[in-house]
Amino acid sequence: MKKNKITAVLGPTNTGKTFLAIETMLSFDSGMIGFPLRLLAREVYDKIIAKVNPNKVALITGEEKIIPSRAKYYLCTVESMPIDKRLEFVGIDEIQMCSDQERGHVFTDRLLNIRGEKLTMLMGSHTMKNIILKLDEDTEFINKERFSKLSYVGHKKISRIDRKTAIIAFSAEEVYAIAELIRRQKGGAAIVMGSLSPKTRNAQVSLYQSGDVDFLVATDAIGMGINMDLDNVYFSSLKKFDGRKLRKLNLSEIGQIAG
C-alpha cells in the first residue's frame, strides 16, 4: 500500500477535532468523513449543506442515503463508508473505537485500509497514539486541549436539576422512565437514542436546541461527538451492561460522555 500523509488529531471530547476535520475536508476538492453515529453524520451533513451546494454533498448511513450524482463530499457512518471512492481527503472520527468489542473490527479495517489521495485524518483519544505510530506512515500528530473544564458537582434529585441539563441512562426503558418523570416535574424533555428513526432523532435534537424543552435524556452514545448546548450532565448510574456483564464505567468513559 502506498505510504500516505496522515494527520492524527488526538485529545478528549469537546476540543474541536471534528470541526478541524470538516474545515480541512472542505479545503480539498473531494473528501469523506466516517463517523461513529448516524446522528453525528446527519448533524455534520446539515452543517455542510448550509455552506456548500447540496448537490455536492452526500449522506450515507445505515438508514439514510442522499447521494447526488455529482457528490464530492461524503458524510457517512464508518460502516457505510464507500471504500472504493478515490477522494483527496479521508477522515475517521473517534478512531479509538478500534478497541470496541462490537464495532472495533470495522474501525480497524478503515484505519488500515482506507486513505485519502492527499491526506488522511484520524480523530480520537490519545490512547491511539502508539497504534497509529505502528502504521509506519508519514504522520503528523496534533494535540488538542479541552475548551471547557469538567467538574464534579455531586448528586441531585431530578426535581432540583437546572435547565440545560442532560441525564445519561443506559437502556431505552430507563431513558423513557426518566423523561416521563421530568415531564411530570419539569414540563418536558427531549430524548436522544441510537434506536430512534433519523426523523424522530433529528426532531428531538431540534426540540432541545430550539429551547422548547430545557432537558435532555439520552443514552451514552451522545458522547460520540454530538454537540449540544449543555451546562450539566448527570448519570443515572455509573454502571452499564457492556454486552457481557454489568460493569462500572471507567474514568475515560465518564469523560468521553460528559465532555
Predicted feature locations:
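Post-DEXD/H (motif II) to motif III coupling segment of the RecA-like Helicase ATP-binding lobe
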Residues: 31, 96-151
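Conserved RecA-like helicase motor-core motifs
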Residues: 52-63, 142, 185-198
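Conserved interdomain hinge at the start of the Helicase C-terminal
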Residues: 20-25, 102, 106, 112-114, ...
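Inter-Walker segment of RecA-like/P-loop motor cores
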Residues: 48-86
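Conserved strand-helix element at the start of the C-terminal RecA-like helicase core
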Residues: 29-44, 120-123, 160-185, 189-193
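Walker A/P-loop
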Residues: 2-20, 133-135
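Walker B catalytic acidic pair
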Residues: 78, 93-95, 237
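Conserved RecA-like helicase motor core of SF1/SF2 enzymes
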Residues: 185-188, 193-198, 202-259
